[in-house]
């Protein structure tokens, strides 16, 4: 068998304190997983449960590299999120066994073309153009789980040009990490190399080219990069 053209390279993420890298298989994302964020977007947490969507694996940006402001939007929003990196997968995974599949955690930014998302919601259409564009998933190095130490209660925060915009607790999530893995595995066969962006707290807003974005999660790591002009 001969390839018609050279296959695209696999996106990889570095591991903290290791020469190994994590090959990305798929990127799953959870929306509406913090009550305060659901409310700031005009929803009701009791009527709007968390939802799943995805991004292409090559949306990942690593090593604090600059991120290019995307075309076709005038309202680009940041969303800081805890990212789960899976070492193994399966289907119908129980809540009790879910964390056994986790390799580690990272800090991620789910960039969103908010104007396109609002229009998609109004029309009842998918969010692909709003969520799955190039460089829409900057991600820090992955911190490996050591001795079962899962950082599920620390602080998650984001600042723009030194001003804090998002500041919350991971324990504020509606669905916990084990519950997210359980729910996803009902719909998809999860695999090693999958990333799961677990949702963002309140405080999202627009950014422009020239802004410096920094985010941190206790016990996981940090990420910092500049948003640059196209």
Q: Where are the predicted features?
A:
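Switch II (G3) loop of P-loop NTPases
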Residues: 200
């Amino acid at each position: 068998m001969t390839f018609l053209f050279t296959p695209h390279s696999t996106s990889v993420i570095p591991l903290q304190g290791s020469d190994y890298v994590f090959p990305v298989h798929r990127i799953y994302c959870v929306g509406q997983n913090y009550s305060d964020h659901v409310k700031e977007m005009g929803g009701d947490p009791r009527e709007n449960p968390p939802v799943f969507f995805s991004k292409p694996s090559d949306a990942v940006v690593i090593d604090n590299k600059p991120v290019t402001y995307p075309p076709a939007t005038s309202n680009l929003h940041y969303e800081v999120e805890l990212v789960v990196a899976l070492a193994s997968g399966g289907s119908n995974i129980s809540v009790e066994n879910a964390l056994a599949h986790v390799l580690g955690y990272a800090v991620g930014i789910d960039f969103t073309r908010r104007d396109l998302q609002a229009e998609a919601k109004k029309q009842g259409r998918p969010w692909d153009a709003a969520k799955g564009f190039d460089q829409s998933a900057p991600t820090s190095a992955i911190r490996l789980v050591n001795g079962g130490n899962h950082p599920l209660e620390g602080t998650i925060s984001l600042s723009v040009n030194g001003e804090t915009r998002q500041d919350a607790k991971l324990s504020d999530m509606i669905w916990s990490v084990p519950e997210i893995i359980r729910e996803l595995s009902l719909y998809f066969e999860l695999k090693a190399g999958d990333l799961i962006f677990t949702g963002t707290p309140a405080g999202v807003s627009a950014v422009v080219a020239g802004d410096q974005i920094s985010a941190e999660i206790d016990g996981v790591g940090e990420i910092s990069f500049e948003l640059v002009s196209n």
